[in-house]
Amino acid sequence: MYIYTVKPGDTLFDIAQKNGVTISALVAANQLSDPYKLPVGLALVIPGQSIRERSIVVNGYAFPGISDIALLGALQYLTYLSVFSAKTRIDGTITELNDTALIRKCYVNGVAPVLTLTNQRESGGFSGDIAHAVIADEEVKTKLIQNVMEYLDRRNYFGLNIDFEYVREEDRTLYTQFLLDFAAALRRVGYSFSVALAPKISQEQSGLLYTAHDYGAVGSIADKVIIMTYEWGYTYGEPMAVAPIDKVRQVLDYAVMEMPPEKILMGMANYGYSWTLPYKKGTAARPLSLSEIPQTAYSQYADIRFDLSLIHISEPTRP
């Protein structure tokens, strides 16, 4: 906690953004009867610790049950921690999380806690049917936005991340409007807003994972865009890297043509796979954690081929 003195031209929105807290937290901490009237010189209590400024912006995802050892080891490197996830129901309600302690630890360590909203079933797996139910019905959509806004305020989140996957191609325009409506509601009270997108290399790219994700539109709507640049190598696929550098580069080269580069957060896989060779089509690869990957290489006396000189992303000129 510390004190901020109101300066000429300050608004509550500006002060909240500048100090990494929500407007509701400022109002509650200072018992403001009229948040829209801030006299110059007023001393405002800024609750908690401000969000650290970094030379790069880093977002991490975590389940509420993450261990303290893993959490505290990661928080020192993060700008945002996206808590995964509140699941959307077809009636516009959401599942709630055991997230109170996690949010508090984020603020104590100068990290912004962000709620991730998904179209996952409660039994698991992303559902295009759930997405359609809440974006195609205005009444349900309004109810969902209201429920999310109330939850963000009640739990003192810093912002919202939307991760809707496998949205139907015919719902592309509806999904974009859904994001616009959420953005308007969030910005009225000063929340940050990010959207997760599938890794596209062109506007025309086909496939259920890609078609409803409009890079240009989302880039103009969201504060940050998290691009899922991974999963080329997958459980039942042929042996290959999870995130091949040439594939990642193709996605980012396209992305910076469609949206401001400073909005883009490149996704990084925190897992790998081990295939049994010779590979037989239809067989499953064994998933590996980041700590298991080098251990597996060492146990097989395999070389780890890591070349930093290959990791360079050019920035094409936007039209």
Predicted regions: what they are:
Residues 12, 88-94, 131-138, 164-172, ...:
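Second-shell loop/turn segments in exported
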Residues 90-97, 173-177, 181-300:
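Substrate-binding surface in catalytic domains of secreted glycosidases
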